[in-house]
Amino acid sequence: MKAFLVGGAVRDRLLGLPVRERDWVVVGESPETMIARGFRPVGRDFPVFLHPETHEEYALARTERKTAPGYRGFVVHAAPDVTLEQDLERRDLTINAMAETPDGRLVDPFGGRRDLEARLLRHVSSAFAEDPVRILRVARFTARLTPLGFRVAPETLVEMRRMVEAGEVDALVPERVWAEFAKALAEPAPSAFFRTLRDCGALKRLFPEIERLFGVPQPPRHHPEIDTGVHTLMVLDQAARLTADPSARFAALTHDLGKALTPPELWPSHRGHERLGLGALNTLCDRFRAPNAFRRLAEKVMRYHGLCHRAAELRTSTLVDLLDRLGALKRHDDTLEPFLLACEADARGRAGFEERPYPQADWLREAQRAAVSVDSRPLIEQRLQGPAFGRALRQLRIAAVRRLRAARSPATPAGRLPHPQGEGE
């Protein structure tokens, strides 16, 4: 059987990166002969099989022909007469159109290795324009490979713009966009995904809520980068530095959507943007059917990031109420940490502030621990119930956090903290 290692495994090995998964292309076989060899068919749209021992995917070499607009209008031809080069030619980028023989010889008919060395993301052929998903894939690869110096080849960017202008991206269903977006969020430089989409004109079609942030000014005293769109992508990259949690990264990306809705005559002030942005956030989440955990965390970060930045200035009662609204006073809560990381990313996502500490997070962590450690048994012994129990427990928590604050020196978060940004100014 002629089986060739293809795609990402070859690319990543040449880049010196860990190989995440190994995919194979088989030449000269049919579904019947593959099944006879013990392979299990799993492909729905084209012949893909699982190896009986390694369970790696083996696909029959195939060609594709476009028959309708969008990304679903394809006729697939998989047969023993399809060559390896024909299979590689249908792929998106030259760096993904390489194969390796069983004895380790590189098969590179489209210059993938050359483009790896030049750090270029270049499309293989004119067939690239037949599938709008490839715009998203190129953007996702920039999110992965920008830290290694990769950029989109000029001719590929031109082709992507033509596809957008022709309305190809309008045929993408939200679930497909979300699938690529979610993968991009997990990459080392997720902001590059959005920059690439903006460069080719696809951002305003697919993520208008993000596109509208560009050109909206913020107070230069707190935001030297000024532009809200620039700030948003800086925050996203800071979130990627701080956490691998995709929900926290999503919350960081969407926290300032309300600033795009501030009337221009009020610029650069954005008072009330936390409330203004909730509708845009829900529209985005509804459109892409975002997971509920993403939506809930993003809503909390949007509503309360300003209060988090002012944590040391808040009255103790307000601080306890904030923790309660965040759901952080439940003993097994796991949402406070991603909330704090998203807020820290916001504070650091400003020109010149990237390495600033964010002691507000530690103060809120300590306050939360003090509040949840309160012993409620005396209230139970008093037979308090319902709202009366809740009010009494709140007072105990306020007293516990007040004691914590009093025990700290003025130089700590119980005293004064540097105000990270004037969100309402």
From Swiss-Prot:
Residues in HD domain copies: 228-329
Known catalytic reactions: a tRNA precursor + 2 CTP + ATP = a tRNA with a 3' CCA end + 3 diphosphate; a tRNA with a 3' CCA end + 2 CTP + ATP = a tRNA with a 3' CCACCA end + 3 diphosphate
InterPro entries: CCA_bact, HD/PDEase_dom, HD_domain, NT_sf, PolA_pol_head_dom, PolyA_RNA-bd, tRNA_CCA-adding_enzyme
Binding residues for CTP: 8, 11, 91, 137, 140
S-S pairs: none
Cofactor detail note: Magnesium is required for nucleotidyltransferase activity.
Record-level GO BP terms: RNA repair; tRNA 3'-terminal CCA addition
Annotated positions binding ATP: 8, 11, 91, 137, 140
GO MF annotation, one: tRNA binding
Pfam families found in the cross-reference section: HD, PolyA_pol, PolyA_pol_RNAbd
Keyword Transferase: yes
Source domain of life: Bacteria
Domain notes: Comprises two domains: an N-terminal domain containing the nucleotidyltransferase activity and a C-terminal HD domain associated with both phosphodiesterase and phosphatase activities.
Function: Catalyzes the addition and repair of the essential 3'-terminal CCA sequence in tRNAs without using a nucleic acid template. Adds these three nucleotides in the order of C, C, and A to the tRNA nucleotide-73, using CTP and ATP as substrates and producing inorganic pyrophosphate. tRNA 3'-terminal CCA addition is required both for tRNA processing and repair. Also involved in tRNA surveillance by mediating tandem CCA addition to generate a CCACCA at the 3' terminus of unstable tRNAs. While stable tRNAs receive only 3'-terminal CCA, unstable tRNAs are marked with CCACCA and rapidly degraded.
HAMAP family: CCA_bact_type1 (MF_01261), CCA_bact_type2 (MF_01262)
Record's subunit section: Monomer. Can also form homodimers and oligomers.
UniProt record similarity statement: Belongs to the tRNA nucleotidyltransferase/poly(A) polymerase family. Bacterial CCA-adding enzyme type 1 subfamily.
Miscellaneous notes: A single active site specifically recognizes both ATP and CTP and is responsible for their addition.
PANTHER family (alphabetical): MULTIFUNCTIONAL CCA PROTEIN
Annotated protein name in UniProt: Multifunctional CCA protein
Naturally occurring in which organism (per UniProt): Methylococcus capsulatus (strain ATCC 33009 / NCIMB 11132 / Bath)
Phylogenetic classification of the source organism: Bacteria, Pseudomonadati, Pseudomonadota, Gammaproteobacteria, Methylococcales
Gene: cca
